[in-house]
Structures are given as structure tokens and as C-alpha cells.
Curated annotation (Swiss-Prot):
Pfam hit, one: DUF520
Protein name (database record): Nucleotide-binding protein Ccon26_01810
Family under the similarity heading: Belongs to the YajQ family.
GO CC terms of this entry: cytosol
Function in brief: Nucleotide-binding protein.
InterPro entries in the record: DUF520, UPF0234-like_C, UPF0234_N, YajQ-like_sf
Keyword terms, alphabetized: Nucleotide-binding
Organism: Campylobacter concisus (strain 13826)
Amino acid sequence: MASEHSFDISAEVDMMEVKNALETAKKEIAARYDFKGLAAEVELNEKEKFITLLSSSDNKIDALKDIVISKLIKRNIPPVAITETKREPASGGNLKATLKLNDTLDSENSKKITKAIKDSKIKVSAQIRGEEIRVTSKSIDDLQECIKLVRGLNLELPISFKNLK
């Protein structure tokens, strides 16, 4: 039996699930009557981690965004993983909206999480390791209590827990 138990906290989005969600969203958009004959596109830029929506009006962009978010939720990707960065005019009188996938644990949120863990007086130690936080303890029960605490923080990130040893 191990004397030290640990897990990692990170903010990751499974890009394969995002691709699958966008494919099902494209199928739904193609089948919907309100998008017949209109420009309605959904594209993923994996490298930059952006989703681009293109349609004829603000209402249609909002409908596209709702479809994409509902498909992402069905694929267990939380809506906090997406923020709309900008809307701008595109060619042909269309509008273009850009959605950013938030999947990095920045230093500000890392510090918030470690401070909350230390303030909770749970017998664990938390260390920031780049884009991850390693939490160690002698008791698995303390680690599970720490997971509950972090889930209750309501951060605007898709928090995931991995490598529970």
C-alpha cells in the first residue's frame, strides 16, 4: 500500500469529443428548416482552439451557438469551456462569431485553487506544476474531500481530475 496518494488538477478539453460534437451539430444544422438556403457554417481550428460560426444574422448566430453548446454538453464538455470572443461582419453580408475553447489552467486560477485548498485545513499539500496542480496526501479520503472542494469553487474552467494514485 502506498504511503502517499496523489492526483492532478487540470483544465483540459478532449478535442476528439469537440470534433464529434461539431460533426453532430453540422448534421443537425443541415437538417433544420430555419437554416435551409442560408449560409450556416461551423468550423474548428484545432491548432488555435477556436470554433468559428458563420451565418446571415445575429439570431442565426445565436441559434448556431445554442446548437453547438448543446452538442458539447451531450459530449460531457461543460459550457464554461467556451467563451465568445468576437462577432464581426464577414463576406456576403454574413456575420462571423468566434468561440474560444478555454482549456488551460492559468496562474491566477491555479493560485485560487491552491489557496482554497490550503484555507480549507484539509491535510493535503498542493503544488503548482505548470498547467497542472499536484495534490498529495496520506489519506485517499482527504483527496476525495479536496476534489469536492475544488468542484464547489465555481471556476469558469472545465476542471478535470486525473492520475488518482
